[in-house]
Curated annotation (Swiss-Prot):
It comes from Arabidopsis thaliana (Mouse-ear cress). It catalyses: a uridine in RNA = a pseudouridine in RNA. Keywords: Chloroplast, Isomerase, Plastid, RNA-binding, Transit peptide. Residues 82-155 form the S4 RNA-binding domain. It is found in: Plastid, Chloroplast. Residues 195-222 are annotated as: Disordered. This is RNA pseudouridine synthase 2, chloroplastic. The active site is at 234.
């Protein structure tokens, strides 16, 4: 079984990385075998260009825009009346509630043939709703001097270790302090206007969205300029992201994500232990009809149009506290929003610290507090009480370099909050 016994010995002040050629060996075992010996970035002798400072390069990426999308439906509200914006949001995947509200206020929605511009208007069963989705409003992303943990950089790509609580790109609720703002400063790019994506909650997605608009051909790219964000991580998720620094690299990496040839490995702490301890879960994922900020695993949802195909492979690395928690490795075959979190919840083992998907602090404490040694109970209470995010970390990222054609792979250790809990659970030895 894969061991990560070296985890507590990691230096957690600055994330380091190990880069190594692809091999059939487990990427995690290689990482944990070599990482304690690595003090700086390691480059294999494989012809990758020397590390260079980022030049002020303009990078064109596609807009995400569902403008003009229309629905004409009769309301079927089983529970009586429902807010107009809530009902429309539940009927359209990939469009944020804020975007729906903007469409209503602009007079693009009618109920029974009459324009309604009040988002809180109630509709009932039998009402006929006509809605046209409005244009995305451009956001201005300004360069900000935000410290970035650069794992690797050359003329074409940038690999970043994203910290917890950093949003990947600006959105209506997060206009500043994002990874994009920091990259604009790092690459000496000017502030830019661009259309925001539809992810207006805490998700940049766990990972890349396989939606068609994310892999639009270069000829249809909009004229706005911003760093080439190819995939995303949730606000609370830490770990590795690759950013394209030119149009060719963006298109090449986007195609790899579309073909699912990118290697993405995550580690998480779960509440409880997955059963069986190793396997593959293939359950479609779609928007949770009862909670707009949450996704849900929906068996059969693809046939009904409510969900999209999603598949994850998992393996229990280590169990703690008599089955109260487990360190789990995840490998993604698809890249749906909140995929790991939704699949873990469906399996009955939500991620520790994931309040949205059921891995609450109270649940974690009920499972762990009495199962650790008495001397460690006070510390486990403190550590879990401080955990304000899902215990999920993107630990390995591998892809084909868009310019050299070489398979490259990067790793970075989990951050201190996750490492401290794992260290305590392992030390407790129950």
């Amino acid at each position: 079984m894969l061991s990560i016994s070296q985890l507590p010995s990691f230096s957690l002040t600055t994330a380091k990385s190990l880069r190594y050629p692809s091999s059939p060996s487990s990427s995690l075992s290689i990482f944990f075998s070599f990482f304690p010996k690595v003090s700086n970035f390691v480059r294999a002798s494989s012809g990758i260009p020397n590390l260079v400072a980022c030049s002020p390069t303009e990078i064109i990426i596609p807009r995400v825009n569902n403008a003009g999308l229309r629905i004409e439906e009769i309301v079927d509200a089983a529970k009586g009346k429902i807010r107009l914006d809530s009902w429309i949001s539940s009927r359209i995947n990939g469009v944020s509630r804020a975007r729906v509200q903007s469409s209503i206020r602009l007079g693009l929605v009618t109920v029974n043939g009459r324009v309604v511009d009040k988002v809180s208007h109630n509709v009932k069963s039998g009402d006929e709703v006509n809605c046209t989705i409005s244009e995305l409003q451009p956001l201005k992303a300004e360069a900000e001097d935000i410290p970035l943990d650069i794992v690797y950089e050359d003329k074409h790509v940038l690999v970043v270790n994203k910290p917890a609580h950093m949003v990947v790109h600006p959105a209506p609720g997060n206009p500043t302090g994002t990874l994009v703002n920091g990259i604009l400063h790092h690459c000496s790019l000017p502030c830019v206007d661009y259309s925001n994506s539809e992810e207006d909650d805490d998700s940049d997605e766990e990972t890349f969205s396989d939606d068609e608009e994310m892999t639009t051909s270069p000829s249809s790219y909009a004229a706005s300029v911003r760093p080439g964000i190819v995939h995303r991580l949730d606000k609370g998720t830490t770990g590795l992201l690759v950013v394209a620094k030119d149009e060719h690299s963006h298109a090449h990496l986007a195609e790899q994500f579309k073909l699912h040839t990118i290697e993405r490995v995550y580690v998480s702490l779960t509440t409880g232990v997955p059963s069986p301890p190793q396997g593959r879960i293939e359950i479609p994922i779609g928007r949770d009809s009862s909670n707009r900020i949450r996704m849900a695993a929906i068996p059969g949802g693809v046939r009904g149009g409510r969900a999209r195909h999603a598949a994850s492979r998992y393996k229990v690395i280590e169990t703690f506290a008599g089955g109260g928690s487990a360190l789990v490795e995840w490998r993604l075959e698809t890249g749906r929003t909140h995929q790991i979190r939704a699949h873990a919840k469906y399996m009955g083992v939500p991620l520790l610290g994931d309040e949205v998907y059921g891995g609450t602090k109270s649940m974690a404490l009920s499972l762990l507090q009495k199962r650790v040694s008495r001397s460690d109970q006070e510390e486990i209470i403190e550590l879990i009480s401080r955990m304000d995010r899902p215990c999920l970390h993107a630990i390995v990222l591998g892809f084909t370099h868009p310019c050299t054609g070489e398979i490259v792979k990067f790793s970075c250790p989990p951050p201190s909050d996750l490492a401290e809990i794992v260290g305590l659970l392992r030390r407790s030895g129950l």
